[in-house]
Amino acid sequence: MTRWRLDIAYDGANFSGWATQPDRRTVQGELETWIPRVLRLDQPTPLTVAGRTDAGVHARGQVAHVDLPDNVDTSAMLRRLSRVLTPDVVVKSVRPVPSTFDARFSALWRRYVYRLWDESSRPDPVTRFHVAPVRGHLDLDRLNTAGTSLLGLRDFAAFCKHREGATTIRTLLDCHAKRLDDPCGTVEVTVRADAFCHSMVRSLVGALTAVASGRRSQDWLDNVAASTSRASSVLVMPACGLTLEEVGYPSDEDLAQRAAQARSRRSHNDICDTCWEDR
């Protein structure tokens, strides 16, 4: 058997997220149904994914891995999948990778982009299912200052839906916004981190837009970010505006080390140790 990397794109509007669910249409469910069929395999082909996107969230740069026979004809596989999959999901490429590659745990970072229209924008009905409206005008200088204040290793519990046994400690690597020079004046908020917990990106954007529109202050955001439990005052933005754009990985020789590091559960001691090292 050989490990294969799949690069995948999908429009999440008509999917109940990535992960397989009973009686629900999901991206994982579609792919795990059709991959063994087009390869004429009599055993299941479970996929491991970089980011388990929620219902309605899109992806241009999703990555998964799967173990398949050594002699897979990737050209034929892609051609057959394009015939049987619906147009809202595409497997863009398939290539062999080292056995140490893990789409989830080997990832160094995930980059999401959230697209918004504010009162300065000119909405386009054709793309409305991929952009979320927000009330008022967004001051991007305020938004970028607020985003910068959240960078680094910290507990993002205030921005995450609770999951029993799951850590909410993450390293936020980049968080900035820009207004595109497009006919709509779309605002793009880029958020990149080593990993994300449930609803974290949409909650971060909800908090940042509250500050950028003047409805909330920077002090409010600072107090929210310091909380170790879910903040009810933070709006979770609609899924339609969010797209997983890219996943970054180390060189092949560092894959196993990165996977082992990612599997280790982080605690508040890690945050304290980092603060001490920065002095």
From Swiss-Prot:
* Name of the protein: tRNA pseudouridine synthase A
One BP term from GO? tRNA pseudouridine synthesis
Per the record, the domain of life is Bacteria
Instruction: Please give the Pfam families that the UniProt record associates with this protein.
Output: PseudoU_synth_1
Catalytic residues, per the record, are 54 (nucleophile)
Annotated substrate binding sites: 112
Gene behind the chain: truA
Swiss-Prot/TrEMBL catalytic activity:
uridine(38/39/40) in tRNA = pseudouridine(38/39/40) in tRNA
Q: Identify the enzyme class.
A: isomerase
Family statement drawn from the similarity comment of this UniProt entry: Belongs to the tRNA pseudouridine synthase TruA family.
The record's section on CDD domains has:
PseudoU_synth_EcTruA
Q: How does it assemble?
A: Homodimer.
Protein function: Formation of pseudouridine at positions 38, 39 and 40 in the anticodon stem and loop of transfer RNAs.
EC id: 5.4.99.12
Record-level Gene Ontology MF annotations: RNA binding; tRNA pseudouridine(38-40) synthase activity
Name the keywords, alphabetized.
Isomerase, tRNA processing
- Which first-to-last residue range defines the signal peptide? none
Q: Which HAMAP family match?
A: TruA
